[in-house]
């Protein structure tokens, strides 16, 4: 696990850095999606709700389209799908306890599970490993973010 400016970043995950989204490949047919600690910090840890559009369970969600709504005291907006896939499941725990997500963003704080429809080509737009760590450090520097 890499630590960048005080935040943990597992190097085996895939990241959409500019959206602060991580993707964990559970199997060839299932990925988990969640927000990074930086994403939660930008929300100021004041989550009031994370709601996955459960009416869309079983439906195809295109890359860039909303798979969840994130609400904090200062922001309400969509969490965009980092890849195209069938929405399989929402983390129902977050409905009752949205603050558990920032406490364990890579574990109990996952937001949704998708069945990727074109993992091979769409995952190429995500970064992983050392490239992800470099991309996050570059983003934090460019945005002049230095929380720790």
List the predicted regions and their residue ranges.
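Acidic, low-complexity mobile loops and tails
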Residues: 1-63, 108-119, 126-133, 137-148
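Conserved hydrophobic positions within beta-strands
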Residues: 20-22, 79, 87
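Short, Lys/Arg- and Gly-enriched loop/turn segments at beta-strand edges
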Residues: 71-81, 96-100
């Amino acid at each position: 696990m890499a630590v960048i400016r005080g935040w943990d970043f597992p190097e085996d995950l895939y990241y959409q850095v500019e959206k602060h989204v991580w993707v964990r490949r559970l199997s060839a047919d299932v990925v988990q999606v969640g927000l990074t600690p930086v994403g939660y910090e930008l929300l100021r840890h004041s989550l009031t709700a994370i709601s996955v559009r459960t009416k869309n369970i079983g439906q195809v969600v295109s890359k860039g389209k909303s798979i969840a709504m994130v609400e904090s005291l200062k922001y309400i907006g969509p969490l965009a799908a980092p890849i195209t896939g069938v929405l399989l499941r929402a983390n129902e725990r977050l409905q009752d306890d949205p603050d558990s997500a920032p406490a364990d963003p890579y574990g109990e704080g996952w937001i949704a599970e998708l069945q990727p429809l074109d993992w091979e080509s769409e995952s190429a737009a995500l970064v992983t490993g050392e490239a992800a760590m470099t991309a996050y450090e570059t983003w934090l520097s460019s945005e002049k973010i230095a929380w720790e």
